[in-house]
Protein backbone atom coordinates (compact mmCIF):
# COMPACT_ATOMS: atom_id res chain seq x y z
CA UNK A 1 0.00 0.00 0.00
CA UNK A 2 1.57 3.31 -1.05
CA UNK A 3 1.26 6.53 0.87
CA UNK A 4 -1.08 8.26 -1.62
CA UNK A 5 -3.54 5.40 -1.21
CA UNK A 6 -3.24 5.58 2.56
CA UNK A 7 -4.05 9.27 2.50
CA UNK A 8 -7.09 8.76 0.28
CA UNK A 9 -8.55 6.62 3.04
CA UNK A 10 -8.37 9.52 5.45
CA UNK A 11 -11.20 11.58 4.01
CA UNK A 12 -13.60 8.85 5.11
CA UNK A 13 -12.52 8.54 8.72
CA UNK A 14 -12.42 10.68 11.85
CA UNK A 15 -9.27 12.52 12.92
CA UNK A 16 -8.45 9.80 15.45
CA UNK A 17 -8.99 7.05 12.91
CA UNK A 18 -6.95 9.10 10.43
CA UNK A 19 -4.03 9.10 12.86
CA UNK A 20 -4.31 5.33 13.37
CA UNK A 21 -4.33 4.64 9.63
CA UNK A 22 -1.21 6.71 9.05
CA UNK A 23 0.66 5.21 12.00
CA UNK A 24 -0.11 1.70 10.77
CA UNK A 25 1.09 2.59 7.31
CA UNK A 26 4.26 4.27 8.55
CA UNK A 27 5.39 1.23 10.54
CA UNK A 28 6.07 -0.51 7.22
CA UNK A 29 8.45 2.20 5.99
CA UNK A 30 9.75 3.94 9.12
CA UNK A 31 13.20 2.34 8.89
CA UNK A 32 13.95 4.18 5.65
CA UNK A 33 12.27 7.49 6.42
CA UNK A 34 12.38 8.14 10.17
CA UNK A 35 15.66 10.09 10.07
CA UNK A 36 13.89 13.16 8.65
CA UNK A 37 11.92 13.66 11.86
CA UNK A 38 12.52 12.30 15.36
CA UNK A 39 9.52 11.56 17.59
CA UNK A 40 10.35 10.97 21.25
CA UNK A 41 8.30 10.50 24.39
CA UNK A 42 10.26 12.10 27.26
CA UNK A 43 9.20 12.98 30.78
CA UNK A 44 5.74 14.51 30.75
CA UNK A 45 5.70 15.28 27.04
CA UNK A 46 6.39 14.44 23.44
CA UNK A 47 9.25 15.96 21.46
CA UNK A 48 9.24 16.46 17.68
CA UNK A 49 12.66 17.18 16.14
CA UNK A 50 12.84 18.25 12.51
CA UNK A 51 15.98 16.41 11.44
CA UNK A 52 17.14 17.61 8.02
CA UNK A 53 19.86 20.07 9.11
CA UNK A 54 21.70 19.92 5.76
CA UNK A 55 18.50 21.23 4.17
CA UNK A 56 17.75 23.69 7.00
CA UNK A 57 15.05 21.25 8.16
CA UNK A 58 12.92 21.91 5.07
CA UNK A 59 9.52 20.28 5.46
CA UNK A 60 8.77 17.27 3.26
CA UNK A 61 5.55 15.34 2.74
CA UNK A 62 7.10 12.36 4.51
CA UNK A 63 7.76 14.52 7.59
CA UNK A 64 4.18 15.80 7.61
CA UNK A 65 2.92 12.22 7.42
CA UNK A 66 4.94 11.31 10.51
CA UNK A 67 4.22 14.43 12.57
CA UNK A 68 0.43 14.54 12.10
CA UNK A 69 -0.53 11.11 13.48
CA UNK A 70 1.94 11.39 16.36
CA UNK A 71 0.56 14.81 17.27
CA UNK A 72 -2.98 13.41 17.36
CA UNK A 73 -1.85 10.39 19.39
CA UNK A 74 -0.07 12.52 21.99
CA UNK A 75 -3.00 14.91 22.13
CA UNK A 76 -5.28 12.05 23.19
CA UNK A 77 -2.77 10.31 25.46
CA UNK A 78 -3.64 11.03 29.13
CA UNK A 79 0.03 10.66 30.11
CA UNK A 80 1.29 13.26 27.62
CA UNK A 81 0.87 16.79 28.95
CA UNK A 82 2.74 18.93 26.44
CA UNK A 83 4.32 18.79 22.99
CA UNK A 84 7.61 20.43 22.01
CA UNK A 85 8.75 20.93 18.41
CA UNK A 86 12.26 22.03 17.47
CA UNK A 87 14.81 21.88 14.65
CA UNK A 88 18.13 20.03 14.58
CA UNK A 89 21.47 21.55 13.68
CA UNK A 90 21.41 24.99 15.29
CA UNK A 91 20.89 26.99 12.08
CA UNK A 92 17.19 26.59 11.40
CA UNK A 93 13.91 25.62 12.99
CA UNK A 94 12.48 25.03 9.51
CA UNK A 95 13.33 27.07 6.42
CA UNK A 96 10.12 26.16 4.59
CA UNK A 97 8.77 23.47 2.31
CA UNK A 98 10.57 21.60 -0.45
CA UNK A 99 9.64 24.11 -3.15
CA UNK A 100 11.88 22.71 -5.86
CA UNK A 101 10.30 19.26 -5.44
CA UNK A 102 6.85 20.81 -5.87
CA UNK A 103 7.80 22.42 -9.17
CA UNK A 104 9.43 19.24 -10.46
CA UNK A 105 6.42 17.14 -9.41
CA UNK A 106 3.98 19.42 -11.19
CA UNK A 107 5.97 19.25 -14.41
CA UNK A 108 5.97 15.45 -14.10
CA UNK A 109 2.20 15.51 -13.46
CA UNK A 110 2.57 13.88 -10.05
CA UNK A 111 0.09 14.38 -7.19
CA UNK A 112 2.58 15.99 -4.79
CA UNK A 113 1.20 19.47 -5.42
CA UNK A 114 -2.20 18.38 -4.12
CA UNK A 115 -1.02 16.01 -1.40
CA UNK A 116 1.60 18.22 0.22
CA UNK A 117 -0.52 21.35 0.53
CA UNK A 118 -3.62 19.42 1.62
CA UNK A 119 -1.82 17.42 4.30
CA UNK A 120 0.30 20.37 5.43
CA UNK A 121 -2.78 22.54 5.95
CA UNK A 122 -4.55 19.76 7.84
CA UNK A 123 -1.48 19.62 10.10
CA UNK A 124 -1.50 23.42 10.53
CA UNK A 125 -5.13 23.23 11.64
CA UNK A 126 -4.36 20.35 14.02
CA UNK A 127 -1.62 22.43 15.65
CA UNK A 128 -4.01 25.36 16.08
CA UNK A 129 -6.68 23.17 17.67
CA UNK A 130 -4.31 21.01 19.76
CA UNK A 131 -5.72 20.51 23.26
CA UNK A 132 -2.28 20.06 24.83
CA UNK A 133 0.25 22.89 25.35
CA UNK A 134 2.28 23.09 22.13
CA UNK A 135 5.71 24.72 22.41
CA UNK A 136 7.63 25.63 19.23
CA UNK A 137 11.29 26.49 19.76
CA UNK A 138 11.82 28.74 16.72
CA UNK A 139 15.59 29.03 17.07
CA UNK A 140 17.19 30.01 13.74
CA UNK A 141 15.62 30.35 10.30
CA UNK A 142 11.82 30.07 10.35
CA UNK A 143 10.13 30.60 6.99
CA UNK A 144 7.15 29.34 5.02
CA UNK A 145 6.28 25.83 6.15
CA UNK A 146 8.27 26.38 9.35
CA UNK A 147 5.97 29.26 10.20
CA UNK A 148 2.99 26.94 9.73
CA UNK A 149 4.48 24.45 12.19
CA UNK A 150 4.92 27.12 14.86
CA UNK A 151 2.80 30.26 14.64
CA UNK A 152 -0.55 28.49 15.15
CA UNK A 153 0.64 26.79 18.34
CA UNK A 154 -0.05 28.09 21.84
CA UNK A 155 3.58 28.94 22.68
CA UNK A 156 6.35 30.12 20.33
CA UNK A 157 9.83 30.78 21.70
CA UNK A 158 12.21 33.01 19.72
CA UNK A 159 15.94 33.47 20.38
CA UNK A 160 18.60 35.95 19.29
CA UNK A 161 19.22 33.60 16.33
CA UNK A 162 15.61 33.61 15.11
CA UNK A 163 15.00 34.82 11.57
CA UNK A 164 11.37 35.01 10.42
CA UNK A 165 10.24 35.72 6.88
CA UNK A 166 7.45 34.95 4.42
CA UNK A 167 9.32 35.55 1.12
CA UNK A 168 6.90 33.77 -1.21
CA UNK A 169 6.00 36.73 -3.46
CA UNK A 170 9.59 36.54 -4.72
CA UNK A 171 9.05 33.05 -6.17
CA UNK A 172 5.58 33.50 -7.60
CA UNK A 173 3.68 32.19 -4.59
CA UNK A 174 2.03 33.87 -1.59
CA UNK A 175 2.43 33.63 2.22
CA UNK A 176 0.36 30.52 2.85
CA UNK A 177 0.19 28.03 5.79
CA UNK A 178 -2.44 30.30 7.34
CA UNK A 179 -0.65 33.56 6.53
CA UNK A 180 -3.99 34.99 5.49
CA UNK A 181 -5.13 34.46 9.08
CA UNK A 182 -2.25 35.53 11.31
CA UNK A 183 -0.59 38.25 9.20
CA UNK A 184 -3.53 40.70 9.06
CA UNK A 185 -3.95 40.24 12.81
CA UNK A 186 -0.47 41.56 13.62
CA UNK A 187 -0.18 45.13 14.92
CA UNK A 188 -1.13 47.87 12.48
CA UNK A 189 -0.19 47.02 8.90
CA UNK A 190 2.90 45.05 9.87
CA UNK A 191 1.54 41.80 8.42
CA UNK A 192 0.80 43.41 5.06
CA UNK A 193 4.34 44.82 4.98
CA UNK A 194 5.90 41.44 5.82
CA UNK A 195 3.73 39.61 3.29
CA UNK A 196 4.36 41.90 0.32
CA UNK A 197 8.07 42.57 0.86
CA UNK A 198 9.29 39.32 2.43
CA UNK A 199 11.09 41.47 5.03
CA UNK A 200 13.15 39.48 7.53
CA UNK A 201 12.50 39.94 11.23
CA UNK A 202 15.36 38.93 13.48
CA UNK A 203 15.87 38.14 17.16
CA UNK A 204 13.69 40.04 19.59
CA UNK A 205 11.76 41.63 16.74
CA UNK A 206 10.15 38.22 16.14
CA UNK A 207 8.73 38.52 19.65
CA UNK A 208 7.93 42.23 19.37
CA UNK A 209 5.91 41.46 16.23
CA UNK A 210 3.81 38.86 18.04
CA UNK A 211 5.12 35.97 15.93
CA UNK A 212 6.71 34.58 19.11
CA UNK A 213 5.06 34.59 22.52
CA UNK A 214 8.37 34.50 24.42
CA UNK A 215 12.07 35.29 23.94
CA UNK A 216 14.78 33.08 25.47
CA UNK A 217 18.56 33.15 25.00
CA UNK A 218 19.52 30.25 22.70
CA UNK A 219 22.06 28.93 25.21
CA UNK A 220 19.18 28.36 27.64
CA UNK A 221 16.98 26.30 25.31
CA UNK A 222 18.31 22.92 26.37
CA UNK A 223 17.72 23.53 30.08
CA UNK A 224 14.33 25.09 29.28
CA UNK A 225 13.32 21.96 27.41
CA UNK A 226 14.46 19.72 30.25
CA UNK A 227 12.63 21.81 32.85
CA UNK A 228 9.41 21.67 30.84
CA UNK A 229 9.64 17.90 30.42
CA UNK A 230 10.35 17.46 34.14
CA UNK A 231 7.08 19.12 35.17
CA UNK A 232 4.55 16.91 36.93
CA UNK A 233 1.23 16.75 35.05
CA UNK A 234 1.57 20.39 33.96
CA UNK A 235 -1.31 22.59 32.87
CA UNK A 236 -0.99 25.27 30.19
CA UNK A 237 -0.59 27.78 33.02
CA UNK A 238 2.33 25.77 34.43
CA UNK A 239 4.03 25.73 31.02
CA UNK A 240 3.43 29.46 30.61
CA UNK A 241 4.95 30.10 34.03
CA UNK A 242 8.20 28.35 33.11
CA UNK A 243 8.40 30.18 29.78
CA UNK A 244 7.74 33.52 31.47
CA UNK A 245 10.55 32.91 33.96
CA UNK A 246 13.07 32.25 31.19
CA UNK A 247 11.76 35.16 29.14
CA UNK A 248 12.24 37.52 32.10
CA UNK A 249 15.86 36.40 32.52
CA UNK A 250 16.89 36.70 28.85
CA UNK A 251 19.73 39.12 28.18
CA UNK A 252 20.57 38.72 24.49
CA UNK A 253 19.63 41.11 21.67
CA UNK A 254 18.31 43.93 23.83
CA UNK A 255 19.14 46.78 21.43
CA UNK A 256 16.19 48.89 20.40
CA UNK A 257 14.34 47.82 17.28
CA UNK A 258 14.83 49.94 14.18
CA UNK A 259 11.75 48.55 12.45
CA UNK A 260 9.46 49.12 15.44
CA UNK A 261 11.04 52.29 16.84
CA UNK A 262 11.59 54.15 13.58
CA UNK A 263 9.44 52.74 10.77
CA UNK A 264 6.06 51.56 12.10
CA UNK A 265 4.35 54.88 11.36
CA UNK A 266 5.54 54.67 7.75
CA UNK A 267 4.45 51.05 7.47
CA UNK A 268 0.99 51.81 8.86
CA UNK A 269 0.56 54.78 6.54
CA UNK A 270 1.94 53.33 3.31
CA UNK A 271 0.49 49.83 3.59
CA UNK A 272 -3.04 50.91 4.52
CA UNK A 273 -4.08 51.20 0.86
CA UNK A 274 -6.49 48.74 -0.75
CA UNK A 275 -4.44 48.19 -3.91
CA UNK A 276 -0.82 47.24 -4.50
CA UNK A 277 -0.51 50.14 -6.93
CA UNK A 278 -1.53 52.63 -4.24
CA UNK A 279 0.83 51.07 -1.70
CA UNK A 280 3.70 51.58 -4.15
CA UNK A 281 2.56 55.17 -4.77
CA UNK A 282 2.39 55.78 -1.01
CA UNK A 283 5.97 54.56 -0.64
CA UNK A 284 7.10 56.77 -3.52
CA UNK A 285 5.41 59.83 -2.03
CA UNK A 286 6.89 59.12 1.40
CA UNK A 287 10.32 59.36 -0.19
CA UNK A 288 12.35 58.25 2.84
CA UNK A 289 15.25 55.84 2.26
CA UNK A 290 13.29 53.10 4.03
CA UNK A 291 10.18 53.66 1.88
CA UNK A 292 12.15 53.80 -1.37
CA UNK A 293 13.95 50.58 -0.48
CA UNK A 294 10.64 48.79 0.16
CA UNK A 295 9.24 50.14 -3.11
CA UNK A 296 12.24 48.70 -4.98
CA UNK A 297 11.77 45.35 -3.27
CA UNK A 298 8.07 45.16 -4.11
CA UNK A 299 8.74 46.07 -7.74
CA UNK A 300 10.90 42.93 -8.08
CA UNK A 301 8.15 40.60 -6.89
CA UNK A 302 5.66 38.72 -9.04
CA UNK A 303 2.85 41.18 -9.88
CA UNK A 304 0.33 38.34 -9.75
CA UNK A 305 1.61 37.17 -6.37
CA UNK A 306 1.43 40.70 -4.98
CA UNK A 307 -2.22 41.09 -5.94
CA UNK A 308 -3.09 37.60 -4.69
CA UNK A 309 -1.37 38.32 -1.38
CA UNK A 310 -3.09 41.64 -0.71
CA UNK A 311 -6.51 40.11 -1.42
CA UNK A 312 -5.65 37.01 0.64
CA UNK A 313 -4.87 39.13 3.71
CA UNK A 314 -7.83 41.47 3.25
CA UNK A 315 -10.25 38.54 2.97
CA UNK A 316 -8.47 36.53 5.65
CA UNK A 317 -8.81 39.30 8.21
CA UNK A 318 -12.46 38.33 8.74
CA UNK A 319 -12.20 34.54 8.23
CA UNK A 320 -11.52 31.69 10.63
CA UNK A 321 -8.25 29.79 10.27
CA UNK A 322 -10.03 26.86 8.62
CA UNK A 323 -11.73 29.19 6.14
CA UNK A 324 -8.37 30.78 5.36
CA UNK A 325 -6.70 27.41 4.80
CA UNK A 326 -9.49 26.39 2.41
CA UNK A 327 -8.97 29.65 0.52
CA UNK A 328 -5.20 29.19 0.46
CA UNK A 329 -5.47 25.63 -0.82
CA UNK A 330 -7.48 26.94 -3.76
CA UNK A 331 -4.81 29.54 -4.47
CA UNK A 332 -1.96 27.01 -4.31
CA UNK A 333 -3.58 24.77 -6.89
CA UNK A 334 -4.06 27.70 -9.27
CA UNK A 335 -0.45 28.81 -8.70
CA UNK A 336 0.79 25.32 -9.57
CA UNK A 337 -1.02 25.61 -12.91
CA UNK A 338 0.31 29.10 -13.60
CA UNK A 339 3.59 30.49 -14.92
CA UNK A 340 5.12 32.57 -12.15
CA UNK A 341 5.73 29.87 -9.53
CA UNK A 342 7.75 27.69 -11.89
CA UNK A 343 9.61 30.73 -13.24
CA UNK A 344 10.37 31.90 -9.71
CA UNK A 345 11.74 28.50 -8.74
CA UNK A 346 13.88 28.48 -11.88
CA UNK A 347 15.32 31.95 -11.27
CA UNK A 348 15.87 31.65 -7.52
CA UNK A 349 16.56 27.96 -6.84
CA UNK A 350 17.65 26.26 -10.08
CA UNK A 351 19.50 28.64 -12.42
CA UNK A 352 19.95 31.14 -9.58
CA UNK A 353 20.15 34.09 -11.96
CA UNK A 354 17.73 36.01 -9.69
CA UNK A 355 16.02 37.54 -12.74
CA UNK A 356 12.58 35.93 -13.08
CA UNK A 357 10.52 36.88 -16.11
CA UNK A 358 7.06 37.34 -14.64
CA UNK A 359 3.91 36.97 -16.75
CA UNK A 360 2.21 39.39 -16.65
CA UNK A 361 5.23 41.60 -16.00
CA UNK A 362 3.25 44.59 -14.75
CA UNK A 363 0.59 45.08 -12.08
CA UNK A 364 -1.74 46.82 -14.52
CA UNK A 365 -1.88 43.68 -16.64
CA UNK A 366 -3.11 41.46 -13.78
CA UNK A 367 -6.86 41.75 -14.32
CA UNK A 368 -9.67 41.19 -11.83
CA UNK A 369 -10.68 38.17 -13.90
CA UNK A 370 -7.17 36.75 -13.55
CA UNK A 371 -7.22 37.36 -9.81
CA UNK A 372 -10.67 35.84 -9.31
CA UNK A 373 -9.51 32.59 -10.91
CA UNK A 374 -7.12 31.98 -8.00
CA UNK A 375 -9.90 32.18 -5.42
CA UNK A 376 -12.64 30.11 -7.07
CA UNK A 377 -13.99 26.95 -5.46
CA UNK A 378 -12.48 23.60 -6.41
CA UNK A 379 -15.80 21.86 -5.79
CA UNK A 380 -15.31 18.31 -4.55
CA UNK A 381 -11.54 18.88 -4.55
CA UNK A 382 -11.70 21.67 -1.97
CA UNK A 383 -9.73 21.17 1.24
CA UNK A 384 -11.72 19.35 3.93
CA UNK A 385 -10.92 18.92 7.62
Swiss-Prot record:
GO terms (BP aspect): valine catabolic process
Modification sites for N6-succinyllysine: 54, 91, 100, 220, 249, 256, 296, 300, 352, 376
Gene Ontology cellular component annotations, sorted alphabetically: mitochondrion
Keywords assigned: Acetylation, Branched-chain amino acid catabolism, Hydrolase, Mitochondrion, Phosphoprotein, Transit peptide
Modified-residue entries (N6-acetyllysine), positions: 54, 91, 100, 220, 296, 352, 359, 364
PTM-bearing positions, type Phosphoserine: 233
Residues reported in the UniProt entry to bind substrate: 120, 145, 168, 176
The UniProt record lists the keyword Hydrolase: yes
Localization of this protein: Mitochondrion
InterPro entries per record: ClpP/crotonase-like_dom_sf, ECH_dom, HIBYL-CoA-H
Assigned EC number: 3.1.2.4
Top-level taxonomic group: Eukaryota
Pfam families named in the record: ECH_2 (PF16113)
SUPFAM superfamilies linked to this entry: ClpP/crotonase
CDD domains: crotonase-like (cd06558)
Main localization (coarse): mitochondrion
Catalytic activity: 3-hydroxy-2-methylpropanoyl-CoA + H2O = 3-hydroxy-2-methylpropanoate + CoA + H(+)
Pathway terms, separated by semicolons: Amino-acid degradation; L-valine degradation
Transit peptide as UniProt keyword: yes
Listed GO MF terms: 3-hydroxyisobutyryl-CoA hydrolase activity
Gene3D superfamilies listed in its UniProt record: 2-enoyl-CoA Hydratase, Chain A, domain 1
PANTHER family: 3-HYDROXYISOBUTYRYL-COA HYDROLASE, MITOCHONDRIAL, 3-HYDROXYISOBUTYRYL-COA HYDROLASE-RELATED
Sequence similarity: Belongs to the enoyl-CoA hydratase/isomerase family.
Its biological purpose: Hydrolyzes 3-hydroxyisobutyryl-CoA (HIBYL-CoA), a saline catabolite. Has high activity toward isobutyryl-CoA. Could be an isobutyryl-CoA dehydrogenase that functions in valine catabolism. Also hydrolyzes 3-hydroxypropanoyl-CoA.
Protein name per Swiss-Prot or TrEMBL: 3-hydroxyisobutyryl-CoA hydrolase, mitochondrial
Gene symbol of the encoding locus: Hibch
